[in-house]
Amino acid sequence: MDTHIYDAIVVGGGLAGLTSGLLLAEKNQKVLVLEAEDQVGGRTSSWNDHGMHVESGFHRYIGYYSQLPKILRKADVELNEMLTWEEKIHVRVGQERPVVMGLAPLFGFVKMIKGLIGNHKYLSLKDKLSLIPFFVGGLLQYLFHPKKLDQIDVRSFAKKCGVTDRAFRYLIIPLSTGIYFLPPTEYSAYVFFGLFAPGVMKFYKLRLGAFNGGMTEVMCEPIARKIRELGGEVKTGVRVHQLQVQDGKVTGVETEAGDRYSCEKAAILATTLHNVKDLALPFKDEPFFANTIYKLPMMPASVIQIELDKPAIEIDITSFAPLTHLASLAEQSRTTFQESEGRLSIILTPPEKFLELDGKETLEIVLKDLDRVGIPIRDHVLDYRKIDHVDDFHSLRPGNQHLRPQQKTPIKSLYLAGDYTHQPYFATMEGAAASGIRAVDAYFKDHH
């Protein structure tokens, strides 16, 4: 049983953990990052699954991010090399051509204007105008009455604001279920507006970025590499079993293999909420933990990735298919999976339904829905993988956001990082990076 001594140990090699590790290593702290899986990245990872290159779920980088870009610059990652920018989205309804919505006011101004004044077949002037009180009222409540807004779901708030059924179907469902895969009747209005509120002052930067490769390869491994270059350590395939606690202080961690790693200053738990609940059991009766993480519910996600003999869609673009099981989808053979002839990645809704189904059953449902929205791929499927995340997300249903804990805990030398912790963002890459930054800020305030 080996013992290794560090200034700080970070449990979890996702974006929150890598952010924490990089900022600590940058300040000459002897830091160790431990990741349970065989690759870094956590919910933003990619790997080879028995011969098929897959990722944890299909992700998009939002152009108004500000915290994550700082970390990527420190890791020498060039944003425009990592991403292919999208200035519009597709909403697929039936067999007809997709509804095109421009979303980049600076980089795709003409496309955005066409989307706003066009699409009359689907959205009348009345439909579009009905969205104004919804967005204005929602953003104002987000700023001034957040707890009240977190008590109502998106569907109920839209009805209250007079959003028409067509506007709700073609715009609100894609922007809610399409992003966080919950039905609008179960989706907190506070979370919905919280996705957009941080970008209001940076609205001109709005656009989406598709990754030009697996997220481990193009984003997360470069951060891990920079940590190592700065003298830190990053170990994969190491699952932490429990915290070592002495006199109320966290002094290290023990792995499932029986190895012990000691920390002289602190441990940062940057793993999933589910894992944090297991690791923090020695402190479960402390009010800080009892009233936050042990009350904060979790929710699942389910994704299917389909390998094809040709592209399913003519361009790689973020698409939504409201009123189907396809929360959001994208062809990725020209961006993330360039070694593939065709690759369709789909986030499924409701995820609970698909956790109970095997891959074959899931594929059949998906193929039928794809036929409904004009993407017939049944004769072109080569392989597929269904990837489930049972408890990886904190619940975005109404009434839960006040339960998110601060990064600094009352336990000496223990900090939390993860997008479930309290910061301005939710289940996003930006939230993960922001939480890591806040955890390290708290660390240095205590160890200056």
Regions found by a protein language model. Name each.
Residues 4-33:
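N-terminal Rossmann-like FAD-binding beta1-loop-alpha1 element of flavoenzymes
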Residues 133-243:
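Active-site/ligand-binding neighborhood in enzyme catalytic cores
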Residues 64, 178, 269-271:
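Short, well-ordered coil/turn residues at beta-beta hairpins
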Residues 16, 39, 274:
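Conserved Rossmann-like nucleotide-cofactor binding loop
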